Amino acid sequence: MGYWGYLIVGRSGQPLAETDALRAVRDGLTPRERRDDGWQVWEYPSGDGDIGSMNTLAVETDAPALFGYVMDSRCVVLEAAAPQSGAWTTCLARNAMAGYLGAGQDEGEGEGEGEEAEEGGEEGGGLTLDDYFLEPGDAARRAVDWAAEAGHTVNTGPLLDVLTSEPDPLAENLFFRFLDRLGVLPL
């Protein structure tokens, strides 16, 4: 069984664990990295529960924030927010995420599957991964805006590469590669 839990990233002069936004999970937070420029990574190991809103953390710290919810080291839910550009959600390791959610992916489905899902209505599901998360191209564009608010100039290409990659072998590696491509925590 792989890792389940949150990796929380933000920038502040105080420890993120001391913010009101993370008050509900404060006792379970463990610091993983804290840099001189204020960027921090905190961990909250948990297979359930909710750590709170990244929008709230971004507003409180007046800086971009994001979390990755790692699911069994196979995929990651990514929620990001910045004071000016707002919040967005996507995922890393899309094929594994589709399996967890029981959602198809538009690109990978055969004609019969897509038609069946439409005809089946709610009973057949019919939802795709893009109904839950921004598709990789849109997420890469939002990530560029997020990085700009963090003071970094980045290109969509390297972000898109991470957003369309599969775990190698752990989804956590994708998360930290994504942070590297954002210019936040270089590898």
Question: PLM features: residue spans?
Answer:
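Short, extreme N-terminal segment that most often corresponds to the first beta-strand
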Residues: M1-D36
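Surface-exposed, low-hydrophobicity interaction/linker segments
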Residues: G10-G13, W88, A96-G99
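Short, intrinsically disordered low-complexity segments
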Residues: V25-A96
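Charged/polar, solvent-exposed surface patches and flexible loops
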Residues: D20-A24, T56-V59, D145, D161, ...
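Long, compositionally biased intrinsically disordered terminal regions
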Residues: R94-G108, E116-L187
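Intrinsically disordered, low-complexity segments enriched in small/polar residues
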Residues: M1-W4, W42, F67, L174
